[in-house]
Structure formats: C-alpha cells, structure tokens
C-alpha cells in the first residue's frame, strides 16, 4: 500500500546566472535540468553546479517550482 506523499520527488534545476542576466539577451534561453531528490534527506531547496550551454561555463542551478 502506497502512502500519500512520495519520498523521492522530481525537481527542475534552473541556471541562476541566466535568470539574472536576462536583460543582456546574449543567451538564447535558460538552462534547465530535471532530477530527483529525497525529501527526508534534503528538505530545503537544492542547488548544484552544472554546465550551462547558454553561458558556456559551470554555474549554480537552483531548484524552482513546477
């Protein structure tokens, strides 16, 4: 029997520097990654360093709402 809330949830990580530099219009989009996290181990928002193809470097990607 399954419980109401799953422990492992799917989240979206979005590049924080692309969002801040939206005024420049140098980048043609916003880098997003889809991953999973365990609610019990990481109850706060997740931030990971991932490669952004629009910034051409490794930047911090933060968790966003769906």
Curated annotation (Swiss-Prot):
The lineage of its organism: Eukaryota, Viridiplantae, Streptophyta, Embryophyta, Tracheophyta. GO terms for molecular function: structural constituent of ribosome. Coiled coil: none annotated. This is Large ribosomal subunit protein bL33c. It holds the Pfam family Ribosomal_L33. NCBIfam families: PRK00504.1 (NF001764), PRK00595.1 (NF001860), rpmG_bact (TIGR01023). Disulfide bonds: none annotated. GO terms for cellular component: chloroplast; ribonucleoprotein complex; ribosome. Keywords: Chloroplast, Plastid, Ribonucleoprotein, Ribosomal protein. SUPFAM superfamilies: Zn-binding ribosomal proteins (SSF57829). GO terms for biological process: translation. The gene is rpl33. Belongs to the bacterial ribosomal protein bL33 family. It is found in: Plastid, Chloroplast. It comes from the Eukaryota. Gene3D superfamilies: Ribosomal protein L33. It comes from Olimarabidopsis pumila. Its main location: plastid.
């Amino acid at each position: 029997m399954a419980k109401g809330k799953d422990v492992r949830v799917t989240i979206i990580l979005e590049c924080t520097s692309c969002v801040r530099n939206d005024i420049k219009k140098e980048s043609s989009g916003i880098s997003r990654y889809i991953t999973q996290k365990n609610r019990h181990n990481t109850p706060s928002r997740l931030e990971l360093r991932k490669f952004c193809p629009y910034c051409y470097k490794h930047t911090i990607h933060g968790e966003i709402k769906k």
